[in-house]
Structure formats: C-alpha cells, structure tokens
A protein has these predicted regions:
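Beta-lactam-recognizing serine transpeptidase/beta-lactamase-like catalytic domain environment
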Residues: 90-102, 141-193, 197-400
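Periplasmic/cell-envelope proteins involved in peptidoglycan metabolism and beta-lactam response
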Residues: 1-164, 187, 262-270, 388, ...
Length: 400
C-alpha cells in the first residue's frame, strides 16, 4: 500500500535494520490543470502483461505506465526517459554491504506545444455549460493549433490513481455521453458552416458566377419534401455575400441542386475533406464522409449496390451540410484556414518542433480562383459584421 512521506523517510533512515522488505517507488503523472485540454494531452496507464513482453526489450519495467492517447501517446518515446539503478552487495541476512556501481537515470525530454494557455482556458470556459461540443483555434498561416477543446471532458489525474472509484470509471468508459471521445476529431453534420463549399462549387464550375442573384423563398420542394428557409420567409433576391451573411438555406439549395453532388464532392476534396488532416493525433481522427453519386450507387455503405440511388432530397440536405455530409471540426478549421490564407492547405499540428519543420515544406495550393475565395471572405466578414454572427462582435474584433 502507499506510504506517507513521513513513513517513507523513517523507513529509509532505518533501512539497514530491516531485511526482506523493499520500498517500491512509482512515478505518476500530475496534471495541475486537471481536465484542461484532456483529449489533446491524453493519459497514461500501466502496461499490460502482453505489452511487457515486447516493451521490456526497450527498457520498460513491469510496473511502468505508457501513453495511451493524445500527446502522451504520440510523444511517448520523448517523454518517458530511462531508468537508472544501483547494484549493491548484501549478506545472507539481506543487509547491505557495499555499492557495486550506479547507473544514473535519464529524465524525459520536454515537449513544447503550440497551445496558447489563455486561449485554451477561454475555449474550455465557453464549453463549460454546454452538453457537448468542440472548439478549435488554428493559425491559418501555418496550421499551429492554439486551442483544442472537447466536451464532455475528464480529469486526467483519474488515470494516475492506483485505485479508481467505480462510479467515475463507469462514467468515463460506459457513459452514453462518451467523455473520452475527442469531438474535435470526430465527424458530424457540419450544418451552415458547410455553405462555403456549396458556394465555391457554384463559383468554380461557372454555373453560378460571382454576379449571381437568386430569389430566396419560404420553401422549395425537392422530390417529395419541402425544404424551408430558416426564417420561414426568405430574404428576397440576394447574391453570394448576402447569402452567407444571413445564412440562407434556399439560396444554397438552388446552387447545390444546379451544380450537382459530384461538383460539391470535388470542391470538398480540394479543401481537404474526406481525408486525414495530418495532425499528430491521427489515431483519434475520423476521415468523415462526403457523398457522391458513385457512393450512392454502391449502396451508401449500408445498402445493396444499385438499390440506393441518389434522390433530389439528398442534394438539398448536402447543400447545407446535413445528412450525407460528415466532417470533423479539425477538417473544417483547415478548410476555413485555406479561405483565410489565400488558398493554401496547411497541416494542423500541436508540436512546436513540427511547426518549425513545416516552415521549410512547400505549401499545398488548393487550385481555386483567388477572386472566388475573396467573395467567400467578404461573405464571412459580413457574417460577424452584420449577419448571423454579429452577436459575437461587440466592436472588439478587427476584421482583416
């Protein structure tokens, strides 16, 4: 069982009077910020018997812990250090006679992250009263992750405890809310933030050029369903910038239906969707799903090929980021970074060392008309100036 510091000192001072007794010291992680950035940092746990058979050859001991997810897992080799020790001679009674030599231990290396502590604290605060969600703050110039928060979360120190309370254990591993799931890297319906993809499909195909004006309506019928405008009225005749500003559904239904599913799919791939982003935490990352006509023909992943054709209702849903579109918040942040930086896909990363390495790498250009990207930027600027996002801007945001 664990000894108090006082008992440990007394025992070590009188160690020569005891025989057949050994003090086992265990190194544990202490996380002073508890749940802050839990999914990013990750946790450690003891190695299993099967793991020990392999890891013992790398210097691990049977009671060692190993990183399981997040930074703790990715940078295990950098963080763990190496054990030292002392060889001693004892007599038949187990009494120490002399030291035969020592091998100094080596501490692990520091791993510096790109995370801004104040920004991370702010992201966690925003999510505090929410049932679930994720927030990512990324530098669009180079992909450095400044904040990454996921809710629900958990206290990292739980995994450092020798004896884990059953109630907390069950909450973490068996709760329907799945607090161990990193929602920043899991795929969901994106909703209205997807409308930039539909807009670019209209612009890049030339079917809906930059001067396009469309009549928005209370409702537009596709197939057997009436797809409504979110204000149930419409916004009159508007173009791209105003459509983004007010987040019009019926504007983007018309664009999406006009260009078709495969044009939207093509643009989405240029923006990095349906693929891993390259972040170090790729084992937690989901590629997501962007529908295509070929995907529908093959059975949509669950049906019989040829029996689940593409229908008009699908394109309406896809145009505004619902149902047949599943993307991760990280993918979305990367796509928006490409809009902001003039058309370059950056590699998201949390390691400061990787940030320096990426400076010498050639940037990947998405290959879209700069004028079209400018239209999207103008529309997004209007969102927070006088649109659906105006409530977050109290004059404190400097808009580029």
């Amino acid at each position: 069982d664990d000894l108090s510091i006082e008992d440990l000192i007394k025992f070590e001072e009188n160690e020569s009077f005891f025989s057949g007794i050994e003090i086992s010291k265990k190194v544990i992680r202490n996380y002073p910020y508890k749940s802050l950035g839990a999914h990013l940092i990750g946790y450690t746990s003891p190695i299993t018997d099967n793991e020990y058979k392999i890891l013992s050859k790398k210097g691990y001991r049977i009671n060692d812990v190993i990183g399981r997810i997040g930074v703790e897992y990715i940078f295990e080799n950098d963080l763990r250090g190496k054990w030292g020790g002392e060889m001693i001679e004892v007599n038949a009674a187990g009494m120490v006679q002399q030291s035969l030599g020592t091998k100094p231990s080596q501490k692990g290396n520091d791993v510096q992250l790109t995370i801004d502590l104040d920004l991370q604290l702010m992201a966690e605060e925003v999510l505090k009263d929410k049932k679930g969600g994720a927030i990512i703050a990324m530098d669009p110039r180079n992909g450095s992750i400044r904040a990454m928060a996921s809710k629900p979360t958990f206290d990292l120190n739980f995994f450092s405890k020798e004896f884990k309370p059953e109630k907390e254990f069950n909450r973490l591993f068996y709760s329907s809310s799945k607090p161990l799931l990193n929602r920043a890297l899991n795929a969901y319906d994106p909703g209205s933030v997807w409308k930039i993809v539909t807009a670019l499909a209209g612009l890049e195909t030339g079917k809906f050029p930059s001067d396009t004006l469309l009549e928005t309506q209370p409702c537009i019928t596709y197939g057997s369903q009436c797809f409504r405008e979110h204000n149930d009225l419409g916004f009159g005749e508007i173009g791209y910038v105003d459509a983004l500003r007010v987040s019009s559904n019926t504007f983007f239904y018309q664009v999406g239906y006009g260009v078709g599913v495969d044009a939207i799919n093509k643009i989405s791939k240029q923006l990095g969707f349906s693929q891993l982003t390259g972040i170090e935490l790729s084992l937690q990352e989901n590629k997501g799903l962007i529908a295509s006509s070929d995907w529908a023909k093959k059975g949509r992943g669950w049906g019989e090929p040829g029996k689940t054709p593409w229908i008009p209702e699908d394109i309406a849903s896809m145009s505004i980021g619902q149902f047949v579109v599943q993307v991760t918040p990280m993918q979305m942040a990367r796509a928006y970074a490409a809009i902001a930086n003039g058309g370059y896909l950056v590699t998201p990363h949390v390691s400061l060392a990787k940030s320096k390495d990426l400076l010498n790498q050639k940037k990947f250009k998405i290959g879209m008309n700069p004028d079209n990207l400018k239209i999207i930027r103008n529309g997004l600027r209007e969102v927070v100036r006088a649109g659906t996002g105006a409530s977050i801007n109290y004059g404190s945001l400097t808009l580029p």
